Design a protein with these regions (language model features):
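The conserved beta-strand core of Leucine-Rich Repeat
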Residues: 1-199
Length: 199
């Protein structure tokens, strides 16, 4: 493992404790992960506790997702402000931590370039679909009242799309507490003509 500057030059891996004057970082990009990386990240726990973290997990490797949940997620969870996931990573993370979204008190933005907007029944159990877990997170109010954002692509057939929108309307009608959120959908060309006013 090595640390590399943005210009590609490797830096020595630090062995000493982090200096107290270090109060944050702009970006940490991890391409390879093992216990050495986890040990290095643990030295940043003080900073993770005071920073807003924008986390991106794009992997097709199930074992990497499992490693992230077991070793890195507990360190970052309370400070994650936004998370970008692909379907494989999201599904595996949720298998290991079904309530991963609602367990992040600072989380305001969830994005996936994959289609996980297939049904809008609110559920947070281990057996819930990815979309049901997102629905549960969206309808769980933040303590500060700030709105949440969810963004994904939609490639569903038109009839499934209509059913999902009806479920979303019903969820709004049945909400037990006021919530504010935005949903941004990137529709496939076949669905553009299916868009109708929400109410």
């Amino acid at each position: 493992m090595q640390i590399v500057k943005s210009n590609g030059n490797p830096l020595p891996f630090p062995q000493n404790p982090l200096p107290n004057k270090l109060i944050g970082f702009k970006r940490i990009q991890i391409i390879y992960i093992d216990q050495n990386v986890v040990a290095f990240l643990r030295r940043f726990r003080r900073i993770f506790a005071i920073c807003a973290i924008d986390l991106i997990i794009i992997t097709e490797n199930v074992r990497i997702s499992e490693f992230v949940v077991l070793n890195i997620w507990p360190m970052l969870r309370d400070s994650i402000r936004s998370i970008i996931l692909n379907t494989v990573a999201f599904r595996r993370l949720r298998q290991l931590a079904p309530t991963m979204l609602t367990d992040c008190p600072s989380l305001r933005f969830v994005m996936s370039n994959d289609d996980i907007f297939s049904e809008f029944l609110i559920d947070n159990s281990a057996m819930a679909s990815d979309c049901q877990a997102v629905a549960k997170w969206l309808f769980t109010p933040r303590s500060d009242g700030l709105p949440k954002w969810f963004r994904c692509s939609v490639n569903s057939p038109a009839d499934q799309w209509s059913s999902t929108m009806e479920q979303l309307k019903m969820a709004f009608s049945n909400a037990s507490s006021p919530v504010t959120f935005f949903i941004v959908l990137k529709l496939s060309s076949t669905l553009i003509g299916s868009v109708v006013p929400f109410f």
